[in-house]
Amino acid sequence: MQTIFAQATARGKAGVAIIRISGPDAFEVGRCLLGSLPDAGRFALRDVRTPLGELLDRGLVLVFKAPASFTGEDTVELQLHGSVAVVRAVEGAIRSTGLARLADAGEFTQRALLNDMLDLTQVEGLGRLIDSETEAQRKVAQASFEGGLSDKAERWRHLMIRAAALLEASIDFVDEDVPVDVVPEVQSILMGLDTDLAKEVTGAVVAERLHDGFEVAILGAPNAGKSTLLNVLADREIAITSDVPGTTRDVIEARLDVSGLPVTFLDTAGIRDTVDVIEKIGVQRAIDRALAADVRILLEIDDWILPDVLSDTIDFRYRAKADLSDGEGISGRTGVGIDRLLTDIEGVLSEKMSAVRSAVTDRQRGGIEAARVSLDAGVTVLSGTAELELAAEHIRHAQRSLDSVIGRVDVENLLGEIFSRFCIGK
């Protein structure tokens, strides 16, 4: 395997830049540039020179001996001054040794996977951790990166192996006097697994919303103050406000951090019967987005009736334009009621978040759901004809589905897509 190198910190001018070198010739590359290396696990200040002796920079050098490194390979890290020119010169010097090439996107992490330093769920958790923008996203992604889903998957896998082994033993000794009926125990194992997997799937749906951002739809009649409220929440003018009803035609979005949760507020068209074709399209879009949203808030005004299709979906109702009435309700102009609004939204979303255990991706959820389908089929067989061979085959199918989640089998075609989302130095 070739030795690779890349800048591990962001490109551009900065205080410090880190260049990582990993692979069988990493130490030799380091000696070409530094003369000598500190002992593994130690750091030292060194002059960085070209193979011909030209001084390029002076910085800290860290050495990691395989397998005690991120990639599981011999690794050298150079902490340099973050000048674009310095980084370019040092990378050129590394390349000139002929011992290393520039890494592909995500190649360091890919090597960590291939060297069993990480499994596939941890790799995907790392990707989510890098992408995290809010505290809730960070915590959930960190749980995946630390192996939260991996540990559960291993436990489920061992239970499946035990259930299949019990059935196989009964099949092998079918003509002998086997004193114990294993079917009740196997059924108990499978039903317990089904409960665990169902909880994980439920949490996965919310985890995906956490990654993409929860949606909160602001609904109401035309000129109810929805756009004004959105502008106040976003702390900038992103929606046009006017006394003319029907100003908002399309859905306007503002992404915010609400107590560590990523939330996209949706300013929707005022809902009313209209003969205006364009406004009618806007009203339908408002209804469609509201039905798909995680939370729906309604700004109420007198003499206006919410359409039946939305009447049972509203999470919170607030009196609109409180600045023009007795002060009860909510007002985008004065800020009355906005703290209560945010607290209400946080409460609903925090309750949804209680089902999330780790940053489960769509791919992982698909594998878990497939495993659950196979387990349910096994339970059905055992409850009916009790054909042990068929039930055992369903369990083996479930195990293969679970193995694909953590990267034991059938993942080669996924690696290119997964690692292409990483930066060059990761």
From Swiss-Prot:
Binding site for Mg(2+): S227, T248
Annotated GO CC locations: cytoplasm
Compartment list: Cytoplasm
Main location: cytoplasm
Co-factor binding comment: Binds 1 potassium ion per subunit.
InterPro entries xref list: G_TrmE, GTP-bd, GTP-bd_TrmE_N, GTPase_MnmE, MnmE_dom2, MnmE_helical, P-loop_NTPase, Small_GTP-bd
Keywords linked to the UniProt accession: Cytoplasm, GTP-binding, Hydrolase, Magnesium, Metal-binding, Nucleotide-binding, Potassium, tRNA processing
Residues that hold K(+) according to the record: N223, S242, V244, T247
GO biological process, any: tRNA methylation
PROSITE patterns xref list: G_TRME
Enzyme Commission (EC) number: 3.6.-.-
Family: Belongs to the TRAFAC class TrmE-Era-EngA-EngB-Septin-like GTPase superfamily. TrmE GTPase family.
Protein name, entry field: tRNA modification GTPase MnmE
Annotated source species: Jannaschia sp. (strain CCS1)
Upper classification of the organism: Bacteria, Pseudomonadati, Pseudomonadota, Alphaproteobacteria, Rhodobacterales
The gene coding this protein: mnmE
